[in-house]
Regions:
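Basic, Lys/Arg-enriched alpha-helical interface segments
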Residues: 1-64, 82-84, 100-102
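Enriched for short, Lys/Arg-rich terminal
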Residues: 69-103
Length: 103
């Protein structure tokens, strides 16, 4: 069995997640914890299978992948870092935005 990679979250992604969670709790009372639940699920997937997300072609940084969270309609943008090997979540971006996140 493969070991889970540690996951770091950038300051930008932390702020985006907080904003999304605040909005979601106010506007989606039937599923107030959906953002957190979907992020936990995504983290579980990418920590074991870093290549699970599609290559992010809508940003200028190379090596970035994105995983779609269909239930909440957000993308998690992340990349694999080495030495030590780990995942960094770079952005949390709603699918309705016309362009990619500011990376």
């Amino acid at each position: 069995m493969s070991r889970r990679l540690d996951i770091e979250i950038s300051d930008l992604a932390k702020a985006q997640i907080r904003t999304a969670e605040d909005w979601w709790r106010l506007n989606r009372p039937k599923a107030p914890n959906a953002i957190r639940e979907e992020l936990e699920s995504a983290a579980s997937i990418i920590s074991l299978q870093p290549e699970a997300g599609a290559r992010a072609l809508n940003i200028s940084l190379s090596g970035v992948r994105r995983l779609h969270l269909a239930r909440v309609r957000y993308y998690v943008y992340y990349w694999l870092l080495t030495d030590p090997q780990r995942i960094e979540i770079l952005a949390f971006w709603h699918e309705s935005r016309g362009s990619g996140p500011p990376l």
